[in-house]
Amino acid sequence: MTVVTVQDSLLDLADDPAPGPLRPERVPLAHGAWVDVQRGWLAGSGALFARLAERVPWRAERRRMYDRTVDVPRLLCFYGEDADLPDPVLTACRDRLSQHYQAELGEPFRTAGLCLYRDGRDSVAWHGDTTGRGSTEDTMVAIVSLGTARPLLLRPRASVGTGGNDSTMRYSLGHGDLIVMGGSCQRTWEHAVPKSTRTTGPRISVQFRPRGVR
């Protein structure tokens, strides 16, 4: 079991955890990509963070990178299509997102990937979710953030050009914030959570995806 201590003052502990109405702000990007952002969508995110930190069977992984095997700089847990999610609040989030985006996505969100960033040394490198259908089809990835805010960076892929937007976009996400990456975002843009040299508390990222997208 991974034990994570979080200062109560840094978290939203005011209410029982529950997703609110979905009223995201959409930001169009180049090449048919877009992001939706809604701050504080999940109320009571601090209580949910504490439950997930304790209940989820977090795993440390190692992956092959070029000529060596390296530690993945975060803890992981994946819940497939038929798996029960570790907390009913996550089920409520997934179902509400599926209902809201049904007209655009045409299918429900099916899986949930959880990442635990223990401190500023944990990170995820530049990438797109292009394993499976995301490499050729428009799709969506919805991310709910819990715990200490960390920046999520987005930039156009070099292979498709900037489309007039050559700057890196930065979203500081935490405390129940929601970001949804849609359209062509996974194959025409990249995203990352960089390392931080500052003293940084833990963060949990919950990623909801449709079938066949990783």
Identify the role of each PLM range.
Residues 1-214:
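Non-heme Fe(II) oxygenase metal-center motifs and adjacent flexible, charged/small-residue loops
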